[in-house]
Amino acid sequence: MAEPRVFLKENRGRIEENYLEQAKNLPRVFAPVDEKLQKCTEEVALACKYLYAFMPYSDIGNYPFEVFLDYAENGVKLWKENPQVADLPEEIFLNYVLFHRVNEEEIAQCRTYFRTEIGSRIQGMNFREAALEVNYWCAEEATYHCTDDRTLSAISVYRRGNGRCGEESVFTVNALRSVGVPARQVYAPKWSHCDDNHAWVEIWCDGKWYFLGACEPEEILNKGWFTNASSRAMMIHSRVFDTKIPEGEVIGTDGMVTMLNELKRYAVTKE
């Protein structure tokens, strides 16, 4: 008889250690958080501790515990009920399914709501199939609109029904993560053919990353209007908030964020 799986067995120790370090630095802030964690299940409490251990200080100060609880509870539910999610490498699950932040967007509860809205549409699908279907759902709910305001939260993009590419990709990444599909935003800070930039989405399945245009569904992965443009880009990068980098080439840091070079997936590169 197989032994029961242990939630985050490989990373439990470092999560606890990093959480305690954060709490030591901000004792007055973490005292009420610790009280609320005692009322959670062991798995949900550990998921919350991961979020608090690696989130920016601004998130700790700006948002109540209940916001992060939504992300933690949804992540644990997916891990318990979806074998595909439970089989993910822990670092992929932590960074690209559980984690609440995508880029510099506002944070608001959304994961449980998105899962209830999308869940029936992807029943029985693998990650590849689910990613395509989720993107169709995202296209039904939001379309492109150029704005210069601060990046909205995923739920705000959903309610407003539109957003610029950075907001569409934040929305799509959250929708994908809400149903257990590992996802992240990637960004080309400057096109070579014009004075502009673009953000889109990558999903992880079968041990590899694939791309798609946020709210721009295609019938296959690795296809988008930006395919040719990205092949001439000077840089395409993703962001990770954890200090233990899942994989990839580190090209720099910005505060507690690490930038990873993703250009080789789109263009011919040379070491």
Q: What does each of the following model-derived ranges do?
A:
Residues 2-160, 245-248, 255:
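Secondary-structure boundary elements
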Residues 121-206:
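Active-site neighborhood of thiol-dependent amide/isopeptide-bond enzymes
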Residues 145-146, 178, 186-195, 199, ...:
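His-Asp-centered catalytic microenvironments across diverse enzyme cores
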